[in-house]
Regions:
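Long, contiguous alpha-helical scaffold regions
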Residues: 60-112
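Short metal-binding segments enriched for Cys and/or His
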Residues: 30-52, 60-69
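Short linker/helix segments within small regulatory modules
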Residues: 18-30
C-alpha cells in the first residue's frame, strides 16, 4: 500500500533529494499535512545514521542541538517498512531482521 504518515494519516509523496549540508544529501521529504520529516534507509542496515540525519533536521527546526532534544517533549518518531522502487509500505516496522528498507519519520512538536 502507499505509505501514509503515522502522525496524521496523510499519504506521503515519493522521496526526493534532500541536501543536509555541502557534503551530504539523502532521499527523503516532509509530510504535506503535518510537516513530519522522513528519510529513506534503502537497505534497512543504516537506520542509526538515518535517525541522526532526521533528528538533525528536526533540531534545526527547533533551533536546538541534537543532544539537547528529548523524545516525547521535542519530537516523536516512527519507523515504517518501505520499498523505494515501488513507493510501497507495509506500515510500522515490527522488527529489523526482515531485509526490508525503512522510512524513518520524525514529527517535531510545536512549542507554545
Amino acid at each position: 500500500m502507499e505509505p501514509t504518515c503515522p502522525f496524521c494519516s496523510s499519504k506521503l509523496e515519493p522521496p526526493r533529494t534532500v541536501v543536509l549540508n555541502v557534503m551530504e544529501s539523502v532521499q527523503g521529504g516532509t509530510c504535506g499535512s503535518c510537516g513530519a520529516i522522513y528519510i529513506v534507509d534503502q537497505t534497512g542496515k543504516n537506520l542509526g545514521e538515518v535517525m541522526l540525519q532526521a533528528l538533525g533536521l528536526a533540531a534545526d527546526r527547533l533551533s536546538k542541538d541534537v543532544s539537547d532534544m528529548v523524545m516525547g517533549e521535542d519530537y516523536e518518531d516512527a519507523v515504517l517498512n518501505y520499498d523505494i522502487r515501488s513507493h510501497r509500505s507495509t506500515g510500522v516496522s515490527k522488527g529489523f531482521m526482515d531485509g526490508q528498507g525503512r522510512l524513518y519519520m520524525v514529527n517535531v512538536k510545536r512549542r507554545v
